[in-house]
């Protein structure tokens, strides 16, 4: 049996997550254009050029040092001049409110969410859900 396109793209997001050096949470994201083309990927990790030290990936330091997968995806697309307008973003975990803001501002039209879980407060996700709904960004499980 052949996998569906959504399964295929979520597989890319999971593959991107495998690049994360975070010992407890690996998140990946992939932006797919309206014609099914992959436009950008991202995973949670240190910013480009920042020294990669293991202690920076441990709690609570990682909250100060790391960027979320969705933030890295948006930043990488901007860095190389790729528009995310109208894209679907496949992400392994539900976006937090900060990442929701970035995705909305980048013009993403749909979020496809994997089954990953995090220890972030529930209010993060509730706020993100409201922002997605109010801004017209569709969310699919």
Predicted regions and their residues:
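Zinc-dependent deaminase catalytic domain
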Residues: 1-141
